[in-house]
């Protein structure tokens, strides 16, 4: 029986990529800078980063290969039990869809559309079309913004007027924040569908519904009912090939949204690290032969990376690490565990955006030979390795190391 379990540690980069200069990210290192800050005693209430299980899988060694420096505080004198390395991104952007699609064998070699202006970000003709087609009383925002700050700035006015909050970032995204109770969740989703259609000429990667609750400035909180409306991947991914071969592909968290529901046979919802881990373990127990279980642990990115919360990111990493033994106990002889990321989001870096970084490539299980797999020239080596292991058609990009 062959099964693959992919744990996507969203935004967990391990060192500035070779082309980081094109993105203003030279020197970024999500893992390295978190580890350094913890080891130096710079984070109140924290000591050195403690990741014993990830270290056994080769995380520290992968970090050293990627950046030239072993992550401070991690155990270097450890017997590594998995295959470890790092991968450079071929895709043109440092965004979520590009990273996920490339990992599954489909790099994004075209340029996404972006809204570059920080104020009055969206074209007026687009805004007018949205107002008309959705029957809106108007809109708020129309700017680059932090997803939490924009709620404090505009949340009360949104509740009072019924005008949705429209904002973007350095990514190829159009984000819409609305109050779940005063505006309505389904109404927000309907608005996102309308915007997704209107954005077709602009080549924007995602429309993101950002529902929130709360009564006023200072206590607004985003809920777990986020929904991403992605464009379709431009070619079949390893997930499509598994589904077409009669296998199962289980999406946990936002995976199905990122792949626009393509190649998915079962969707499982989950919010927060604890619930995502619980759902993952449940699906591992239930998985049959020729199954991929794919979980996105989004909190690393959304709650800690973008918010530049070093302590929160470090604590979340340690919690994630503490759950790994539960997964290991469930593994059977034909199982492969993959731990990786889709981009970086260094919480010590300036701004609030993603960082262009190498990603960790960690494979573990009885079919996997322990040791370094070195530098991988594309994230697609991960998908190609999974395809080869399961006897699926060869992907157009990537080289298997299994």
From Swiss-Prot:
It is an enzyme of class 5 (isomerase). Its EC number is 5.4.2.7. The keyword Repeat does not apply. Pathway: Carbohydrate degradation; 2-deoxy-D-ribose 1-phosphate degradation; D-glyceraldehyde 3-phosphate and acetaldehyde from 2-deoxy-alpha-D-ribose 1-phosphate: step 1/2. Keywords: Cytoplasm, Isomerase, Manganese, Metal-binding. The lineage of its organism: Bacteria, Pseudomonadati, Pseudomonadota, Gammaproteobacteria, Aeromonadales. One of its GO terms (cellular component) is cytosol. Isomerase that catalyzes the conversion of deoxy-ribose 1-phosphate (dRib-1-P) and ribose 1-phosphate (Rib-1-P) to deoxy-ribose 5-phosphate (dRib-5-P) and ribose 5-phosphate (Rib-5-P), respectively. Mn(2+) 2 binds at residues 301, 306, 354. PANTHER family: PHOSPHOPENTOMUTASE. Its cofactor is Mn(2+). It comes from Aeromonas hydrophila subsp. hydrophila (strain ATCC 7966 / DSM 30187 / BCRC 13018 / CCUG 14551 / JCM 1027 / KCTC 2358 / NCIMB 9240 / NCTC 8049). This is Phosphopentomutase. CDD domains: PPM (cd16009). Belongs to the phosphopentomutase family. Binds 2 manganese ions.
